[in-house]
């Protein structure tokens, strides 16, 4: 069973390593959430992770199994139309431990914290639109397509697309 706690600065390297191994490169192919065929490079850096941990309007939740960080999610408080919502991102589970329910319980734990601490009225996230398996996974957790899309962000210092025309699709869950 996973135990959860909010990340601290001491966790920065472990978080960046886990997120990058789950999203990109050959190690990510051990799981079902890989972006290795879509993007080269890194998903995040230790600097980005540290800045998220330091924010008052965000937290990174860690899933720990047998004293090892195996899952992570970033939750940011935002205001949309005058209402508190939470944006979920950087959701990662160690590739060799995916498909065991850890991702679902991680998301539910982050949602519970955001509901309790921020009194949010909903959640949203962005996924690469051609990742139908991810959209289906999030749909099983109550997230629905919003019909909103945006171009995939350019960050040539970190990642390079392997395919053209990537975009992000927004999903939302109303409480």
Predicted features along the sequence, with ranges:
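Residues that form or flank phosphate/diphosphate-binding pockets in enzymes
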Residues: 83, 101, 133
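Active-site acidic-Proline motif in GNAT/NAT acetyltransferases
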Residues: 94-100, 129-130
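Short glycine-rich hinge loops at helix-strand junctions in the catalytic core
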Residues: 101, 118, 142
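C-terminal "cap" of GNAT-fold acetyltransferases
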Residues: 121-136, 140-175
């Amino acid at each position: 069973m996973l135990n959860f706690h909010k990340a601290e600065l001491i966790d920065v390297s472990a978080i960046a390593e886990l997120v990058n191994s789950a999203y990109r490169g050959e190690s990510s192919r051990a799981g079902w959430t890989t972006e290795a065929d879509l993007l080269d490079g890194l998903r995040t850096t230790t600097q980005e992770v540290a800045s998220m941990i330091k924010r008052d309007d965000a937290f990174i939740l860690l899933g720990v199994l047998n004293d090892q960080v195996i899952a992570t999610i970033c939750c940011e408080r935002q205001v949309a139309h005058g209402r508190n919502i939470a944006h979920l991102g950087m959701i990662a589970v160690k590739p060799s431990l995916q498909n065991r329910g850890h991702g679902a319980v991680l998301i539910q734990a982050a949602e519970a914290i955001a509901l309790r601490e921020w009194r949010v009225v909903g959640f949203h996230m962005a996924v690469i639109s051609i990742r139908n398996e991810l959209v289906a996974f999030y749909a099983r957790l109550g997230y629905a397509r919003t019909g909103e899309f945006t171009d995939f962000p350019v960050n040539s210092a970190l990642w390079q697309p392997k395919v053209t025309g990537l975009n992000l699709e927004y999903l939302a869950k109303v409480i």
